[in-house]
Design a protein with these regions (language model features):
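Conserved beta-strand segments of alpha/beta enzyme cores
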Residues: 21-23, 96, 155-157
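Conserved core of the sugar-phosphate nucleotidyltransferase
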Residues: 8, 12, 59-136
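Conserved N-terminal catalytic core of the sugar/cofactor nucleotidyltransferase
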Residues: 1-50
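Conserved beta-strand scaffold positions in the cores of enzyme catalytic domains, especially
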Residues: 24, 74-75, 158, 166
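Conserved alpha/beta core of the MobA/IspD/sugar-nucleotide pyrophosphorylase nucleotidyltransferase superfamily
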Residues: 111-182
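Short beta-strand-to-loop acidic/aromatic patch adjacent to the donor-nucleotide binding site
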Residues: 48-59
Length: 182
């Protein structure tokens, strides 16, 4: 891998967006998935703060932080879909999440890849509780972290968004379709 290129690209985009306060944590080794990458990236922070995570292979158009973020321990955005290549939500009452699965369709509520945790300390504690049986296809994914939080009494919610607010670009075909769209 060529290290340094990604941070320069990110700095350029941050400047373009006018973001004044930020940190870039560059990982120099492969990880066992997105959840481990996030865990490693947060290790040196001693103050607690909320975190938003978004999959790099998805574009979320016109995102605005929802008010629900101040009223729950975590949330994930979903769209109505099908297939087995998503994270899924088993819904409860009032948009609560009973459990999540990875690549295992338990409903038609598919995560678009946007995840919120009110406390990065909660996320880290839940990640530390994972073991090899929590790996899916050799990776630790973000969505299943919510199951630990839910078992510990956390209030995790989902928000439904329109498929029109999302563009996918994780496969070659999705990328080609995205290029044609723009």
């Amino acid at each position: 891998p060529i290290y340094g290129f990604a941070s320069e690209f990110v700095k350029m985009k941050i400047a373009h967006l006018g973001i004044k306060s930020y940190d870039i944590v560059e990982l120099l080794d492969d990880t066992a998935g997105q959840a481990e990458s996030l865990f490693i990236g947060l290790e040196d922070y001693r103050d607690d703060f909320p975190i938003y995570v978004f999959n790099i292979d998805t574009i979320r158009h016109n995102f605005i932080k929802p008010g629900i973020a101040s009223n729950c321990d975590g949330f994930l955005e979903i769209f109505l879909g099908s297939g087995s290549n998503w994270s899924f939500v088993e819904p409860g009452d009032n948009y609560s999440v009973i459990r999540t699965t990875e690549k295992d369709p338990i409903s038609n509520l598919c995560s678009n890849g946007l995840y919120f945790f009110r406390s990065h300390f909660q996320f880290q504690e839940a990640f530390r509780g994972l073991n090899k049986s929590d790996l899916v296809k050799g990776e630790f994914y973000i969505a299943p972290i919510y199951n630990t939080l839910i078992r510990n009494g956390a209030d995790v919610r989902y928000i439904e968004v329109s498929p029109d607010s999302i563009s996918f670009c994780g496969t070659p075909l999705e990328y080609v379709n995205l290029l044609e769209e723009f």
